């Protein structure tokens, strides 16, 4: 770490420490003497007493000094050693400050000298603030001037009608055009987001279902591939490009044909009028429901036949 970085770190840490100290250095905090910079507070602040110029010195004042000394001492009584830390200050330094404050303020002569010094110090401090106050006033004037300029600019925005002939020219920098430009950019963005998007229709939507009542004896001997190539394809490829032909494994007289486009589907629907085929638009839900029902019925028939064969076999043994 460079020397400059280390110095900045130390300054930053010291500043943070001082800020934390100042946040808790007030009479409402029971442990305030642990946070205050003991060199910066006076004896009255140490004892939580209000400084009053030309304060009357009597027995009541002395009793108040002793009473408040006992009050502020309570914050360091829990410690076992005067070398322990009471937050940021040692117990020793806190007790020394309390002791000095009690001795000075309870003695009329010492108190008078101390009050004179304190009064002089406060007057000196006030004088030292004068240049700073002057700087603040100058800053305030500058800020006020900028506020007035901003106010005039806002008035121009909402009252003056600009010449919109150059509104689309990005080289023209004028606050009068800002709302017009924002509106045009917004409308352009909305059109871009809401423009029509053309989505290509999937070929899986271009399917038809072909049924016919019964298969001839020759057709019953055909395989699924032969049915597709010899019966379905010659009849339906005239309507368009066929991508797939699917023959139902449970029912060979039910075929699914997938075309390349929807126009072919519409043309194929016309074969109902002059052929033995019944053509409908393919529905996945309907197809699978029918297929499952037929599969269940076939299995029921097989089980019933097996039961009947078993009964006949049992009769032969009786």
From Swiss-Prot:
SUPFAM superfamilies given for it? RNA-binding domain, RBD
- Reading the lineage from the top rank, the first entry is Viruses
Which Gene Ontology MF annotations are present? nucleic acid binding
Record's protein name: Uncharacterized 37.5 kDa protein in LEF8-FP intergenic region
Organism of origin: Autographa californica nuclear polyhedrosis virus (AcMNPV)
The taxonomy runs: Viruses, Viruses incertae sedis, Naldaviricetes, Lefavirales, Baculoviridae
